[in-house]
Amino acid sequence: MRLSHPYPFLLSTDFVKVPNAIVTIGTFDGVHQGHRAILEDMVNSAKEIEGETVVITFYPHPRQVLNIDSSNLRFITNQEEKIKHLEEIGIDNLIVVNFTKEFSRVSSESFIRDYVIENINPAKIVIGYDHHFGKNRMGDFSLLQDLASQYKFKVQRIEAHDVENIAVSSTKIRLSLQRGDVEHANMLDRKSVV
C-alpha cells in the first residue's frame, strides 16, 4: 500500500495519480464491519475496471482539532493499527491528511473539487450512508451526486451495516467500550480490548 502524508490541499509529491481511482473519505476509526463493507466494495470495483483504491483519512481526528467531545474521546484503533487493517483489506493507496483548524474551514464543494478531483481525478467516490464532509460537515451524498454529473465521476452510497438491527458505527463501539461492555462492542465488530 502506498502511503502519503499531504499538507492540506496538496498531495505529497510521492503520490502519483492512478487511473480509474475508486476513492473513499473518512476517519475509519476501528475499521469496523460498516467500514469494511465500503472498503471491500471499493476493492471489488477497482478490480472490475482495472483501477486502484484510494482512501483519504485524517490525522489527528477532526474531533480532537475542533474540540468536539475530545476530552472523553477514546479511539478504537490507533493510526498504525488503522493502516494495518486497511492494508489487510487490500487498499492500494492511503492518503493521510493533516487535519487542522484551517483545513476544517474548507467548504465541502471546494474539498471535492480542489482536492479530490484536482489531485486524484476519481472514477468513483464511495461513501457510507451517513457520511458528511467539509466545513460544518455540510457535504453529503446529495452534493456528491451534483458534483458527479458536473465533473464526470460516479458516486455510490453504501447503506448501513446492521448487526442485530443495530447500525454499526465507531461511535456505538466506542460507547460500548466506555461502558465496559466489551461483549456488545465485539458483537458490533471484531474483538475489542479495553
Tell what function each PLM region has.
Residues 2-194:
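Nucleotidyltransferase catalytic core that binds NTPs
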